[in-house]
A protein has these predicted regions:
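Extracellular beta-helix/beta-solenoid repeat scaffolds
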Residues: 149-151
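Non-catalytic, conserved peripheral segments adjacent to functional cores
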Residues: 40-146, 155-156, 161-163, 173, ...
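Cysteine-centered motifs
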Residues: 26-30
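Hydrophobic transmembrane alpha-helices
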Residues: 165-177
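Short hydrophobic targeting helices and cationic amphipathic motifs
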Residues: 6-7, 19, 23
Length: 208
């Protein structure tokens, strides 16, 4: 009885503001249980992978961690200096994030790992826009891996906005920030005016 009394009296000592927020939360859970559950699941799994894989924020959006860099070094025309033959990372996007349009000198292969499927928006060297789907639902046109050729501008977003996508990215010749360029919204829109809407959606208004 003393313990029960302590709990009740403690509850009444909570400030009015906290009581109001508590009742709002309870009301939200009762009214939108599936939405609240989805929010909890999103945080649970996205945060799990971010912590488990030691992911850090990526300048193009999302989170990443380096996983492999070949010891074999090569020199190729068009590259400033030597490069590792191959590199790989883990890359994670949450449903409210996107990978901004960017371009690379090397080919990149995306591999689906976990979570929801995502869409990649690829503008090739001829200016043609293509949408490709990375995910586990092969019958719905998704694929487990996708190659983005060097010289293409591309962006990505998660198809389920309450979920996340965890992928692996393999680059050959190996990744170097010297070979990577984030898209400038204004300049890209001028280069490809027919794709202005999608460019504005998947670029940042504040340029790096």
């Amino acid at each position: 009885m003393k313990f029960r009394y302590f709990l009740i009296s403690s509850a009444f000592r909570i400030s009015n503001d906290y009581q109001i927020e508590y009742h709002r939360l309870c009301s939200c859970i009762c009214k939108y249980p599936s939405k609240v559950h989805s929010f909890i699941v999103l945080n649970k799994y996205a945060k799990f992978w971010i912590k488990k894989l030691n992911l850090s924020k990526h300048p193009e959006g999302g989170y990443f961690a380096d996983t492999y860099k070949s010891d074999k070094i090569i020199r190729l025309p068009g590259y400033d200096g030597s490069r590792s033959i191959c590199t790989a990372i883990y890359y994670l996007l949450t449903g409210n994030q996107f990978s901004s349009f960017h371009i690379m000198k090397s080919d990149e292969i995306w591999h689906f790992c976990s979570g929801s499927s995502l869409t990649l928006y690829i503008i090739d060297s001829k200016g043609k826009l293509k949408e490709a789907f990375l995910g586990p639902n092969i019958s719905k046109g998704e694929t487990f891996q996708l190659v983005i050729k060097s010289g293409c501008w591309f962006a990505a977003s998660v198809n389920e906005k309450k979920s996340y996508s965890l992928v692996g990215c393999t680059v050959s010749p190996g990744f170097d920030y010297k070979d990577w360029e984030i898209g400038n919204r204004k300049r890209l829109a001028e280069m490809y005016p027919e794709h202005k809407q999608i460019i504005e959606r998947y670029t940042s208004a504040v340029q790096i």
